[in-house]
């Protein structure tokens, strides 16, 4: 059985006080699920020193380069040295706001994997792509770009997060059944291209506004193995409520 993962993506939010409050609440997170926190770069050191044992640290982005004259970039080896286990790559906001295409996302995935980090690859379709019935085409291309770059056993030891971009800030919501359908497609695509046993063990997280009041229903779906939590991860009580839903499921 796949172990569920609840990862908090703070985006460009948070401060030293939030690190302290989340660390205090995370001390109550004993359970079968894994808890991870991905704060902004300047808060990584504080989080690494304060998060209780068993709570993983992650970063929100990584450079595809190992070192060099790349002002503002942070390499995978630097994140590893800072105490990170996870790193998010290909988040919809990076793709949309900063023009990161599938090729660049694949490069970041490879860099993270080669350094010993666990990449959380984000995939998902926009509202226009959803309405044009291109969900599987778009998500498939995003997955294929990474599998083409890595070769065999691409997702061994990795994580995927499905972001229904069409249901974020659009007034439309994804039902648990709609989310499950895409998660099942992702697992099937990896099974076809990578390996069956890797696909069976691959954690696929839901990144579409999972909250305390809908977490249990989403996590009950057979191919939803946790959540990449945005806004709710900034509220320690809500974040731990989602974690508890995963740990008890």
UniProtKB/Swiss-Prot annotation:
Enzyme's top EC category: isomerase
Pathway recorded for this protein: Carbohydrate biosynthesis; gluconeogenesis; Carbohydrate degradation; glycolysis; D-glyceraldehyde 3-phosphate from glycerone phosphate: step 1/1
Highest taxon in the source lineage: Bacteria
Catalytic activity reported: D-glyceraldehyde 3-phosphate = dihydroxyacetone phosphate
GO molecular function, one term: triose-phosphate isomerase activity
Gene3D superfamilies to which the protein is assigned, alphabetical: Aldolase class I
GO cellular component: cytosol
Single GO BP term: glycolytic process
Pfam family, one: TIM
Cytoplasm is among the record's keywords: yes
EC number from the UniProt entry: 5.3.1.1
Record: residues binding substrate: 9-11, 169, 209, 230-231
Protein keywords: Cytoplasm, Gluconeogenesis, Glycolysis, Isomerase
Function recorded in the entry: Involved in the gluconeogenesis. Catalyzes stereospecifically the conversion of dihydroxyacetone phosphate (DHAP) to D-glyceraldehyde-3-phosphate (G3P).
HAMAP family, A to Z: TIM_B (MF_00147_B)
Identification of the protein by name: Triosephosphate isomerase
């Amino acid at each position: 059985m796949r172990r569920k993962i609840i990862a908090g993506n703070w985006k460009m939010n948070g401060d030293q006080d939030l690190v302290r409050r989340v660390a205090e609440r995370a001390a109550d997170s004993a359970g079968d699920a894994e808890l991870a926190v991905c704060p902004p770069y300047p808060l990584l050191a504080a989080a690494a020193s304060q998060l209780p044992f068993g709570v993983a640290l992650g970063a929100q982005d990584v450079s595809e380069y190992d070192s060099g004259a790349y002002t503002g970039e942070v390499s995978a080896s630097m994140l590893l040295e800072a105490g990170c286990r996870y790193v998010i790559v290909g988040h919809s906001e990076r793709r949309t706001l900063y023009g990161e295409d599938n090729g660049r996302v694949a490069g970041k995935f490879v860099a993270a994997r080669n350094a010993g980090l666990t990449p959380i690859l984000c995939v998902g379709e926009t509202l226009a792509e959803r309405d044009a019935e291109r969900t599987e085409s778009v998500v498939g291309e995003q997955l294929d770009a990474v599998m083409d770059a890595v070769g065999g056993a691409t997702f061994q030891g990795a994580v995927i997060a499905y972001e229904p971009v069409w249901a974020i800030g659009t007034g439309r919501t994804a039902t648990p059944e709609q989310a499950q359908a895409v998660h099942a497609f992702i697992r099937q695509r990896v099974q076809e291209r990578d390996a069956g046993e890797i696909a069976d063990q691959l954690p696929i997280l839901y990144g579409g506004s999972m909250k305390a009041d809908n977490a249990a229903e989403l996590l009950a779906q057979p191919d939803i193995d946790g959540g990449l939590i945005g806004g709710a991860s900034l509220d320690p009580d809500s974040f731990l409520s989602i974690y508890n839903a995963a740990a008890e499921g």
